[in-house]
């Protein structure tokens, strides 16, 4: 049984009509960057809960979550309506294996995300531990519109902090926007456009690819890399070149 604790909302940041971030103070147990927990509210006499990844570094007591409002959702519209001072239930122990401990050493670590799935990478990069074993870090955030790239300022801040080791790239699929590639991640890999923009190759000799977000993107990218680059899923018992987390 999960141990639930009561958290207090300290900040609600509305990025767009649908995207928002919640900052919460709660007595949770220590977690590993890249992990997720569950948020819950009592609705009509029952606890409605969903899993959300931590965006904040584990050493930051401001627990941050990046959410999208599902119009007919049972929980997300209620979470979006919370105000500072309101209470929210949080599972105290984090879960998940989308963490650096599960990633083998390589020259270039590619971190690819769609939508709100940028969260785990931001947690990992803000903490900044266990990254010395990679020569290059690449963070790619794909969204429909440029307005949905909520954490671009933080990505740019991190890029400066890593002094050339981290390269960032945004992707939009429904419009063209300055500084962003246009299209979907699998197609941009297939055409070579993503590697060209970054200036690094994505191959099994030098790279490990982390994939987080839309299950279709994850599946399509895995299939493409398997077929065209002979890259394989990474398992503890059989090391490979791809680590993935589906976001729904």
Swiss-Prot record:
PROSITE patterns, per the entry: FAD_FR (PS51384)
Pfam families, A to Z: FAD_binding_6, NAD_binding_1
Family: Belongs to the ferredoxin--NADP reductase type 1 family.
Organism annotation: Shigella flexneri
Protein name, as recorded: Flavodoxin/ferredoxin--NADP reductase
Keywords: Cytoplasm, FAD, Flavoprotein, NADP, Nucleotide-binding, Oxidoreductase
Molecular function GO terms recorded: ferredoxin-NADP+ reductase activity; nucleotide binding
Binding site for FAD: 50-53, 66, 74-76, 116, 247-248
Annotated compartments: Cytoplasm
SUPFAM superfamilies in UniProt: Ferredoxin reductase-like, C-terminal NADP-linked domain, Riboflavin synthase domain-like
Main location as per UniProt: cytoplasm
Reactions catalysed: 2 reduced [2Fe-2S]-[ferredoxin] + NADP(+) + H(+) = 2 oxidized [2Fe-2S]-[ferredoxin] + NADPH; reduced [flavodoxin] + NADP(+) = oxidized [flavodoxin] + NADPH + 2 H(+)
An example Gene Ontology CC term for this record: cytoplasm
Protein EC: 1.18.1.2, 1.19.1.1
Gene Ontology terms describing biological process: cellular response to oxidative stress; heme catabolic process
Residues annotated to bind NADP(+): 143-144, 173-174, 184, 214-216, 220
Cofactor(s) this protein cannot do without: FAD
Function, as annotated: Transports electrons between flavodoxin or ferredoxin and NADPH.
Enzyme class, first EC level, given as a word: oxidoreductase
Superkingdom of origin organism: Bacteria
């Amino acid at each position: 049984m999960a141990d639930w604790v009561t958290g207090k909302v300290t900040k609600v940041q509305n990025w767009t009509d649908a995207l928002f971030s919640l900052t919460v103070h709660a007595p949770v147990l220590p977690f590993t960057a890249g992990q997720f927990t569950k948020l819950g509210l009592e609705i009509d006499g029952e606890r409605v809960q969903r899993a959300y990844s931590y965006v904040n570094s584990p050493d930051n007591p401001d627990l941050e979550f990046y959410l999208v409002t599902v119009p007919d959702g049972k929980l997300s519209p209620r979470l979006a309506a919370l105000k500072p001072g309101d209470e929210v239930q949080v599972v105290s122990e984090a879960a998940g294996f989308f963490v650096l401990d599960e990633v083998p050493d390589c020259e270039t670590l590619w971190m690819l995300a769609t939508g709100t799935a940028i969260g785990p990478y931001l947690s990992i990069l803000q903490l900044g531990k266990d990254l010395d074993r990679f020569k290059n870090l690449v963070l790619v955030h794909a969204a429909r519109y440029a307005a949905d790239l909520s954490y671009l300022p933080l990505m740019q801040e991190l890029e400066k902090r890593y002094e050339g080791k981290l390269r960032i790239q945004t992707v939009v699929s429904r419009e063209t926007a300055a500084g962003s590639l246009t299209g979907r991640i699998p197609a941009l890999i297939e055409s070579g456009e993503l590697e060209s923009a970054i200036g690094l190759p994505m191959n099994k000799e030098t790279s490990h690819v982390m994939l987080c977000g839309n299950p279709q993107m994850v599946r399509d990218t895995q299939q493409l890399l398997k077929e065209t680059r002979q890259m394989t899923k990474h398992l503890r018992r059989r090391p490979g070149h791809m680590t993935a987390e589906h976001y729904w």
